[in-house]
């Protein structure tokens, strides 16, 4: 990019708007090229052609959005460090408490909060992210996390022991499955009962805590992929889209065909 900027600085007038526009479209504004993007944006903004100048404004806007995102995510990492001098802080979250079918899944994640130059951008409450972004982030989180673990209870366990017990149980099992023992566990929503370790709960933790947000994303992707596989076996329930929740299509299929082996019978009393 340095050579491109140098050439543009000397010969920008020889670049047509289309060429400049195509170059800007191909640019990936990221943490490694912020200085170069700013230099290019300033250069384009100074061009007398309004359409070229507008491309500079667009680049500048993209750069500012990246900087804001960095600050947002850094604050999530700072939040995890705000509880005290803990070396390893784990976040734990669940997905699948409310569906009529499928498991409840929990994930626990420990991040490297000591290196703020390598934070994972765009992490958030998994429900606020697109499916594509969740899938992408899930792989990045698994690669960059110091440790992560996933636990689940299936529909039979939920019917036998209750959703409250299973929710707490998968929290514990996910934390116990980490290959690094956490000094502190941050749990989304409420404290973990009968947990043998330091634990603090965070209301709406998946929007405040970096490690809880990462756990939310991993758990969501893992469970969604399970439900996509069940969709192949039971296509009439539309599990690929509703992932087990009680949509009209799902409820209509239940009334017409009846439940499957993955349905939570204790959740269907008011439906069947």
Curated annotation (Swiss-Prot):
A divalent metal cation binds at residues 93-94, 188. CDD domains: RNase_HII_bacteria_HII_like. Its cofactor is Mn(2+); Mg(2+). Its EC number is 3.1.26.4. GO terms for molecular function: manganese ion binding; RNA binding; RNA-DNA hybrid ribonuclease activity. PROSITE patterns: RNASE_H_2 (PS51975). It is found in: Cytoplasm. It is an enzyme of class 3 (hydrolase). It catalyses: Endonucleolytic cleavage to 5'-phosphomonoester. It holds the Pfam family RNase_HII. NCBIfam families: PRK00015.1-1, PRK00015.1-3. Endonuclease that specifically degrades the RNA of RNA-DNA hybrids. This is Ribonuclease HII. It comes from Clostridium perfringens (strain SM101 / Type A). The gene is rnhB.
């Amino acid at each position: 990019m340095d050579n491109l900027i140098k050439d543009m600085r000397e010969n920008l007038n020889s670049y047509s708007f289309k060429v400049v526009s195509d170059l800007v479209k191909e640019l990936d504004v990221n943490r490694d090229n912020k200085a170069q993007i700013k230099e290019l944006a300033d250069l384009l903004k100074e061009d007398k052609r309004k359409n070229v100048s507008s491309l500079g404004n667009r680049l500048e806007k993209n750069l500012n959005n990246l900087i804001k995102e960095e600050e947002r995510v850094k604050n999530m990492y700072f939040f995890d460090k705000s509880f005290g001098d803990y070396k390893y802080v784990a976040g734990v979250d669940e997905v699948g408490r409310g569906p009529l079918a499928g498991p409840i899944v929990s994930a626990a994640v420990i991040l490297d909060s000591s290196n703020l130059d390598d934070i994972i951008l765009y992490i958030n409450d998994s429900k606020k992210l697109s499916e594509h972004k969740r899938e992408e982030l899930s792989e990045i989180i698994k690669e960059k996390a110091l440790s992560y673990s996933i636990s689940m209870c299936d529909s039979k366990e939920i019917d036998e022991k209750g959703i409250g017990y299973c929710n707490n149980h998968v929290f514990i099992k996910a934390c116990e499955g980490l290959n690094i023992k956490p000094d502190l566990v941050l749990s989304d929503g409420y404290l973990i009962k009968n947990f043998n370790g330091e634990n603090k709960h965070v209301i709406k933790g998946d929007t405040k805590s970096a490690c809880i947000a990462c756990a939310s994303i991993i758990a969501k992707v893992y469970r969604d992929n399970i439900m996509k596989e069940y969709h192949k076996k039971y296509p009439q329930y539309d599990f690929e889209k509703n992932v087990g929740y009680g949509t009209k299509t799902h409820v209509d299929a239940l009334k017409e065909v009846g439940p499957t082996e993955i349905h939570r019978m204790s959740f269907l009393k008011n439906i069947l």
